[in-house]
C-alpha cells in the first residue's frame, strides 16, 4: 500500500497568520490508485505544495461527478472517485474564496 497525504488548508487574506486545515485526506491506497489521483489532479511531483484556484477546484469536482455518473460500484477507481468527491465537497463548504488563499499539500510514500 502507498501512503497518500493530500492536505488542503487556507490562509485568510484578512490575517495571513491565521491558517486552518480544511481537510486532510491521508489514506493508504494501492500505487495504481494513488497514480490515478495524482494524474486526475495533474500533479507530477511528490511532496508538493500548490496554490489552489477556485476554477481548478470546481473543475476537479465536476470532473469527478462526471466520472462517477459513468461508473458503477465495483468498477476500477469507483471507490476512489466516490471518496475524493465526498472529501472535496466537504472542503467546498469550508472555503470563502473572497477571504482565503487556499493551498494544497500533496505527498506520498511507497
Please state what every model-predicted region is.
Residues 1-110:
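Acidic (Asp/Glu-rich) sequence patches and key acidic residues
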Amino acid at each position: 500500500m502507498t501512503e497518500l497525504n493530500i492536505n488542503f488548508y487556507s490562509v485568510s487574506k484578512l490575517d495571513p497568520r491565521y491558517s486552518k486545515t480544511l481537510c486532510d485526506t491521508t489514506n493508504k491506497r494501492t500505487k495504481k490508485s494513488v497514480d490515478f489521483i495524482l494524474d486526475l489532479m495533474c500533479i507530477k511531483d511528490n511532496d508538493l505544495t500548490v496554490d489552489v484556484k477556485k476554477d481548478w477546484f470546481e473543475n476537479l469536482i465536476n470532473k469527478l461527478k462526471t466520472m462517477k455518473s459513468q461508473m458503477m460500484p465495483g468498477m476500477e477507481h469507483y471507490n476512489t472517485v466516490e471518496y475524493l468527491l465526498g472529501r472535496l465537497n466537504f472542503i467546498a463548504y469550508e472555503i470563502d474564496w473572497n477571504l482565503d488563499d487556499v493551498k494544497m499539500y500533496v505527498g506520498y510514500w511507497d
